[in-house]
Design a protein with these regions (language model features):
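Structural motif
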Residues: 136-137, 192-194, 225, 233
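Conserved helicase/translocase motor-coupling segment
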Residues: 63-152
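Helicase C-terminal subdomain and adjacent C-terminal extension
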Residues: 3-34, 38, 56, 202-264
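Conserved ATP-binding/catalytic motifs of P-loop helicase motor domains
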Residues: 1-8, 110, 141-143, 185
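The feature marks helicase ATPase cores and/or their adjacent C-terminal helical subdomains
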Residues: 46-58, 161-165, 251, 261
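Coupling/hinge elements of helicase-like and P-loop NTPase modules
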Residues: 37-77
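Conserved motor-coupling elements within RecA-like helicase/translocase cores
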Residues: 159-191, 198, 208
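A short acidic (Asp/Glu
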Residues: 49-53, 142-150, 188-189, 243-246
Length: 264
């Protein structure tokens, strides 16, 4: 369970790479002082072991009981974007039709690439009549809004994408784009993840990873990594070696997951 936080309640101008977070204790944390705990060991969500193996090792001490997969294909796709740039400061971005405003804490190339990936996923789903839901998750509100705008804009030119969005709107698993804080409780067949952070225009990767750097940031990552039932599409501008060792547990977990996704 994620503890409550005011991290994402700040205004749109708040620079979310600063790592300023105020967590309160969760209800479960408070209850532990009064009640005994018992682990629920059977894992049912992930249809492929590779979607849960990382969390099983790093968070559950390999205590989860995971049904074997029907095939050996690794269910996580690592889309590394070598030329992407993370802009922590405010900038102006325009799409093909109009300006979509000024904002900081965004990665434009990553937003475009993940939007293209989502649109392609939607088109294939409709053309091949494959019923599969999807959700996009990223690290802050600015990138969330940018990705959502890119997808909605691209979908106006792709009838299949519009059909897909409308088809899922009336279900329990509608298409949406969320930030890291708001994805707890969600699940979809496929999760698209924009890790957002990366080198700046000078080629320097700052070690500020927003809510991930918080003392409980690793728990947010665990929630993120375990939302997918069939597959996870990772879009990242980072390689594991640019993340320094040390610091909060969230940073080391983030680095380990990038390595896990890239080496399969």
């Amino acid at each position: 369970q994620l503890p409550p936080t005011n991290f994402f309640n700040a205004s749109s101008e708040f620079n979310t790479d600063d790592g300023i977070v105020d967590d309160d204790e969760s209800i479960l944390d408070l209850a532990l002082s009064k009640f005994s705990s018992r682990m629920l060991r059977w894992h049912y969500r992930s249809k492929h072991e590779s979607l849960i193996n990382f969390s099983n090792y790093h968070f559950y001490q390999n205590n989860l009981i995971i049904p074997p997969s029907a095939n050996d294909k690794f269910a996580i796709t690592n889309n590394y974007l070598k030329k992407a740039i993370y802009s922590a400061s405010t900038l102006k971005k325009k799409n093909a039709k109009e300006s979509i405003g000024e904002r900081g804490g965004v990665n434009i190339i990553e937003a475009n690439e993940i939007a293209d990936g989502v649109i392609a996923f939607m088109r294939e789903s409709i053309k091949k009549n494959i019923k599969r839901s999807c959700l996009v998750v990223t690290m802050n509100n600015s990138q969330r809004d940018l990705i959502d705008e890119e997808i909605r804009h691209k979908a106006t030119k792709i009838p299949e994408a519009n059909t897909y969005i409308g088809m899922w709107d009336e279900t329990m698993e509608p298409f949406t784009v969320k930030n890291l804080e708001n994805v707890q409780g969600d699940e979809r067949d496929y999760i698209f993840v924009s890790t957002l952070f990366g080198p700046n225009k000078e080629g320097i990767t700052m070690q500020r990873f927003g809510p991930i750097n918080h003392p409980k940031g690793h728990r947010r990552l665990n929630v993120l990594f375990t939302r997918a039932k069939q597959g996870l599409e990772l879009y990242t501008s980072l390689t594991p070696n640019v993340i320094r060792d040390g610091g909060e547990k969230g940073r080391s977990i983030f680095k380990s997951y990038l390595d896990y996704a890239a080496t399969q």
